[in-house]
Amino acid sequence: RDLFLEIGGFNESLDTYEDIDFFIRAQKLTEAKIILSPDFKTLHHKDYKFFSFLNEIVKKTYNATFAKLNNKSLFKGTTFSIDWKINLIPMPLPIFLISMYLGKNIYASLSIFLGMFALNLFLTKKIFSKDNLILGNIIILIVGFCAWISSLFATFIFYLVLIKRHLVNFKNILICLIRAIFKYGKPVQIIQYITSRCNLRCDHCFYKNTLDKKDPGELPPEVLIKSAKQSGPLLWYSLAGGEPFLRKDFSDIVNGVKKESSPQIISLPTNGWYTQRTFLSTLKVLQNLKTGLFVIFFSVDGYEESHDKIRGENSFKKLCETYDKLKKLSKIYP
């Protein structure tokens, strides 16, 4: 449970039907070792009919394929252990269809099909129980073939989405460059002050005496997102405070602005005090970030002694802990 909470739990934005993202993060962000026991079995209490089972497998395959292509850096270097003999089971069906399309004799094609099917029965006799050997092969023959088609379709759709994403991004950059060069129209950068709350009292802070007042001056996410949207495409969107990560809705603000005004760069300063909160908020942003950069500036006032003198005891140590933890995210989101 502690590990689950430490690395951010489940990724709600990753629609894969399965929780594979959690295991990948556990391996890449910590020293955790995932061990799969060959004797482990699980029983799902689902009342499947053939077509409901087929429908779920097709959806799972589509979503998993799309998610893997859409998050290549996350899945890079990972392997999924599936018995190679399972992958052979659907092969007789496409080979039969191809041979028929090429004009082969139906009896010859059927002979090839039955020969390959018989070979599958021999290879998979240790996978299926004796009573379900033939039925299991028939089901996976059909379902597996449909899963292949679903995976190919997901790949095709992904590249269409990717082309559209790059074209829209290019258009937004072009609009911003025209504005910047000719100094015309709406701004290409905006800075939004999202909170006056801060946990530190730095000596040089020009409004340290007014921090944490009863009215922190925090606009709701909807207002911040709407104002950014009204500026149109942005080159740079900056958040300011206070300590921005003190807002529980921080990731909602950033993700909303990214969706509505497509800034190429999103940046903010932090004192690095809240290690886990900063990590989880950053993770939620990166999980939704498909284009552009997300930049975090750490406020450092010198070596540990001088830094702590200005910002408070242990502030340098906490900053370093936060930096080290965020750096691990580069393994997943370079």
Pin down the residues of each PLM region.
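Catalytic donor/gating beta->alpha subdomain of glycosyltransferases that bind UDP-sugars
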Residues: 11-16, 20-76
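A short acidic, helix-capping loop that chelates divalent metal ions and anchors anionic groups
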Residues: 45-47, 212-214, 304-311
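Conserved alpha-helical substructure of the radical SAM core
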Residues: 168-294
